[in-house]
């Protein structure tokens, strides 16, 4: 549903059906899972039908985790294939 391309040409995609966030580096033929990918869930670094994503000015990634009624914030290593690190949780009703 949601796609973001950063200044370096890296593509970030919400994969709602598989409950994960994917990343493709510029000119890469394959992507990697940076958040989720462990099945549906409500634990940190798990998602339940993510819907949107956005970076802030500091490079933190915010993911709207629809079925868990929350927004998760992750610190992302943009220079390697390291997965995102869970930082904060915002709950909403």
Where are the regions that the model predicts?
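Conserved beta-propeller blade signature
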Residues: 11-12, 61-62
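Primary detector of tandem Cys2His2 zinc-finger arrays in metazoan DNA-binding transcription factors
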Residues: 12-14, 21-24, 28
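A short, acidic, flexible beta-alpha connecting loop/helix-capping segment that sits on the rim
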Residues: 59, 66-70, 77-79
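Short loop/turn segments immediately following the C-termini of beta-strands
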Residues: 16, 26, 66, 76
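Structural signal for beta-propeller blades
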Residues: 19-22, 69-71
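Cysteine-rich, disulfide-stabilized extracellular repeat modules
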Residues: 7-9, 17, 30, 43-49, ...
């Amino acid at each position: 549903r949601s796609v973001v391309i950063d200044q370096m040409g890296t593509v970030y995609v919400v994969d709602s059906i598989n409950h994960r966030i994917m990343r493709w580096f510029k000119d890469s033929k394959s992507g990697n899972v940076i958040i989720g990918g462990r099945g549906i869930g409500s634990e940190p670094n798990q998602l339940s039908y993510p819907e949107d994503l956005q970076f802030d000015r500091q490079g933190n990634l915010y993911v709207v985790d629809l079925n868990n009624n929350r927004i998760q914030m992750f610190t992302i290593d943009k220079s390697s294939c390291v997965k995102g690190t869970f930082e904060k949780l915002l709950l909403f009703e």
